[in-house]
Design a protein with these regions (language model features):
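An acidic, low-aromatic, low-complexity terminal/linker signal
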Residues: 1-150
Length: 150
């Protein structure tokens, strides 16, 4: 097992913690305002903008919209997590990236039935990090399908 597959990226949306396998991450960017083009949005596909990344435009998805999470973070202060997909890279708009953590720091947690019903399929797992529930972010529920190549 690679070192990257044993690590998780922790990020926040509206104060809620999420974790993401590091193997899915290409890069984290925090200076994004000048690189965004909201005119290239496709709300039907969940794309809120396009991001100029390494001389190409990639779609930007805001999971807070699908999850109905309110955020007080202004767009210019948000962070982008660039993810690998089968059709190319795509970007995830988040409020902040907290840190990296090793997989052994997380404990499995049973997801309550009512929460399973309420999530509308956007997530299916929760893990605990020092007693704080973290939603396991499953990129395939938000945009396209994800490539696990390193």
């Amino acid at each position: 097992m690679s070192v990257a597959s044993q690590r998780k990226l922790i990020f926040r949306l509206g104060g809620i913690g999420f974790l993401l396998d590091l193997t899915e991450v290409v890069e984290v960017l925090d200076q994004i305002t000048d690189a965004l083009d909201p005119g290239r949005s496709d709300i039907g596909q969940g794309i809120v903008s396009a991001l100029r990344f390494r001389q190409t435009w990639i779609p930007v998805v805001d999971p807070a919209l699908k999850l109905d999470i309110f955020s007080t973070v202004k767009l210019r202060d948000k962070t982008v997590v660039v993810l690998r997909g089968h059709e190319g890279n795509w970007a995830l708009l988040v409020d902040q990236v907290d840190r990296l953590s090793t997989a052994e720091n997380f404990q499995p947690c049973e997801m309550p039935f009512l929460l399973k019903v309420a999530t509308m399929g956007f997530y299916s797992q929760i893990q605990l990090l020092h007693s704080e529930p973290m939603i396991v972010f499953e990129p395939e529920h938000y945009y396209g399908s994800v490539s696990k190549s390193a």
